[in-house]
UniProtKB/Swiss-Prot annotation:
Key words of the record: Cell wall biogenesis/degradation, Disulfide bond, Glycoprotein, Glycosidase, Hydrolase, Repeat, Secreted, Signal
Record-annotated disulphide pairs: C389-C395
Glycan-carrying positions: N84, N151, N219, N271, N313, N434
InterPro entries: Glyco_hydro_28, Pectin_lyas_fold, Pectin_lyase_fold/virulence
Organism taxonomic ancestry: Eukaryota, Fungi, Dikarya, Ascomycota, Pezizomycotina
Enzyme Commission number(s): 3.2.1.67
Pfam families, A to Z: Glyco_hydro_28 (PF00295)
PbH1 repeat residue numbers: 188-210, 217-238, 240-261, 272-293
Entry protein name: Probable exopolygalacturonase C
GO BP of this protein: cell wall organization; pectin catabolic process
Signal sequence region: 1-21
Annotated function: Specific in hydrolyzing the terminal glycosidic bond of polygalacturonic acid and oligogalacturonates.
A GO CC term attached to the entry: extracellular region
Molecular function as annotated in GO: galacturan 1,4-alpha-galacturonidase activity; polygalacturonase activity
Length: 440
C-alpha cells in the first residue's frame, strides 16, 4: 500500500501538516464504538466485507465511532449507504478495496446504485489514518481508464466514489487512489476538509472525470491537500457561499480550481458568492483558475478571488468562458444565446509561473478541434489570460494585479479578451483586446 508516484511523494514530503477541526464540536459524546471485522486476510483477499460494514453503520448510526481497524484491509464489493447518521466519526485506519471486476461494478451501477459510499446526516466526521500507508480507498481505476474506447470520453456505468452530505463536520486525511471517476460530492454547511490526497495519475488511458471535490454548500474549506487528477480539483456548484480552497497542491492533468459549469439548464438559477482560492500550486494542468458557464444560463456569481497562485507548465492559467461546451452533453429546453450567468467582483491577484507553450492541452481531447480550444481565435499558447464574456454586460468589476506568467518559449505573454468592457471593468488591469498582455 505504498505511494509510488515520485512527484506525488515529493509534494507530500514538502507539506507542513496543519490540523483543522470541525467548526463546532458535537454536543453529545460519541459513547458507542463499532469496530468493523475483516475477512480479507483469512480469505486471501477474496471475501466481501460489505455486509460487516453495513452492519456497523446500522448499529452505530448515532453518537458513535465506527472504526476500520489500523492496517487492516477491507473488500467493499457492494455500495455502502448510510443516510441516517448523526454525530458519528468514521475512523478509517485501514485500507478499503473496491471490486476489480469491471463488469460486476457496471452491473451494480446499471441497477441504480451509482455511488459507492453514501453518507448523510449532521456532524459526520471522517478521520483517516495519520500513517500515510493507511486510510486509502483503492478503486483500481487504471483498468477502467485503459478500457475506455478510443475517441470517447465516457466509459459506461462508472460509479461515483462518494456522496457526503453533512453539517458541522470535518474530513481529515481522506485518501483516494486510482478512483474510477468522480471522487467526492460534498454538500452541506460548516465543513472543513484538510490533508486530503487524490491520486488519479495514470500509466495509460486518460483518467476522465476524476474530479476531486464537487462542492455545494455554505462555509466549506479545503486546505493542505494534494490532488493529482484528470478533471477539476475543486468544482464549486450552485448554490454555494463562503468557500475557501487554500494551501493546496494540484496537478497532473488537472482542470484546476473551477466554478461550474453553471447554466446548462436555463431554469436552474445560479447563486454563488464569496469564494477564495489562495496559496495554491498548480503543476502540469490544463487550467489553474477557471470559470465555466453555458450561454443561455441565468444567475449571479459574485465576490470571487484567486490569489497567490503558482503555475508550472499550465496551458490556461486564467480562463473564463460564458459559452462553455461539453463534448458529451446535451441541453434541455430553449436556449437564449443572449442570457448569461452574470459575473461580478472577480479578482485574479499574484499569479506567477510558466505557461505550457510546447505541449499544450491534455489527454481529454477526443474531438477536432479539441473541446478546450473551441471558440478561441488564433491560439498561440502564450496566453496568460483568456476572458470570454458572453455579452458586454455579463462581466462586471473584474480586476487583475500582479500577473507574472511567462510562456516557456520566452515569447511575451498574450491575452484573449472578449466583451469585458472598460466601462464595467475600470480596474481590469489591461486593455480588453486580443494580443500581447500589457498590464496597466
Amino acid at each position: 500500500m505504498l505511494i509510488t508516484n515520485p512527484a506525488l511523494l515529493g509534494i507530500l514530503a514538502s507539506l507542513v501538516p496543519l490540523a483543522l477541526g470541525a467548526p463546532n464540536q458535537p454536543i453529545q459524546a460519541r459513547s458507542r464504538k463499532c469496530v468493523i471485522p475483516s475477512s480479507y486476510a483469512s480469505s486471501h483477499g477474496t471475501a466481501d466485507d460489505s455486509p460487516a460494514v453495513a452492519s456497523a453503520f446500522a448499529q452505530c448510526a448515532e453518537n458513535s465511532v465506527i472504526v476500520f481497524q489500523e492496517g487492516v484491509d477491507y473488500n467493499i464489493f457492494h455500495p455502502i449507504k448510510a443516510t441516517n447518521l448523526s454525530n458519528v466519526e468514521i475512523r478509517v485506519l485501514g485500507n478499503l478495496h473496491l471490486p476489480q471486476d469491471i463488469t460486476a461494478v457496471q452491473n451494480i451501477v446499471k441497477s441504480g446504485q451509482s455511488t459507492w459510499f453514501t453518507f448523510q446526516g449532521p456532524r459526520v466526521d471522517w478521520t483517516g489514518a495519520d500513517d500515510i500507508k493507511n486510510g486509502w480507498i483503492n478503486s483500481y481505476g487504471q483498468a477502467w481508464w485503459d478500457a475506455n474506447p478510443a475517441n470517447s470520453s465516457s466509459f459506461p456505468n462508472r460509479p461515483h466514489l462518494m456522496s457526503y452530505k453533512t453539517s458541522q463536520a470535518s474530513i481529515k486525511n481522506f485518501r483516494s487512489r486510482k478512483p474510477i471517476a468522480w471522487n467526492v460530492k460534498l454538500q452541506g454547511d460548516d465543513i472543513t476538509v484538510s490533508h486530503a490526497i487524490v491520486d488519479a495519475t495514470s500509466t495509460g488511458g486518460f483518467p476522465f472525470n476524476t474530479d476531486g471535490f464537487d462542492v455545494e454548500g455554505t462555509n466549506i474549506s479545503i486546505t493542505d491537500s494534494v490532488m493529482f487528477n484528470g478533471d477539476d480539483a475543486i468544482a464549486v456548484n450552485t448554490p454555494s457561499h463562503n468557500i475557501v480552497f487554500a494551501r493546496n497542491t494540484i496537478g497532473y492533468q488537472s482542470h484546476g480550481m473551477s466554478i461550474g459549469s453553471l447554466g446548462k439548464d436555463p431554469t436552474d438559477f445560479a447563486n454563488i458568492t464569496n469564494l477564495r482560492f489562495e496559496d495554491v500550486t498548480v503543476i502540469d494542468a490544463l487550467y489553474a483558475a477557471r470559470f465555466k458557464s453555458w450561454s443561455g444560463g441565468r444567475g449571479l456569481v459574485k465576490n470571487v478571488v484567486w490569489k497567490n497562485i503558482r503555475t508550472f507548465n499550465v496551458t490556461f492559467p486564467i480562463f473564463v468562458t460564458q459559452s462553455y461546451s461539453d463534448q458529451s452533453a446535451s441541453r434541455p429546453g430553449t436556449i437564449d444565446p443572449f442570457s448569461s450567468v452574470m459575473m461580478e467582483d472577480f479578482t485574479w491577484s499574484d499569479f506567477s509561473g510558466t505557461i505550457n507553450t510546447y505541449h499544450p492541452g491534455d489527454g481529454s481531447c477526443v474531438t477536432d478541434p479539441c473541446w478546450y480550444n473551441v471558440g478561441l481565435p488564433n491560439l498561440k499558447h502564450t496566453e496568460a489570460i483568456v476572458l470570454e464574456c458572453n455579452t458586454e454586460s455579463s462581466c462586471k468589476n473584474f480586476r487583475t494585479e500582479g500577473i507574472r506568467l511567462h510562456p516557456q518559449s520566452k515569447d511575451s505573454p498574450s491575452v484573449i479578451c472578449m466583451k469585458a468592457t472598460a466601462e464595467l471593468n475600470p480596474k481590469l488591469g489591461f486593455e480588453c483586446k486580443n494580443g500581447t498582455f500589457v498590464p496597466h
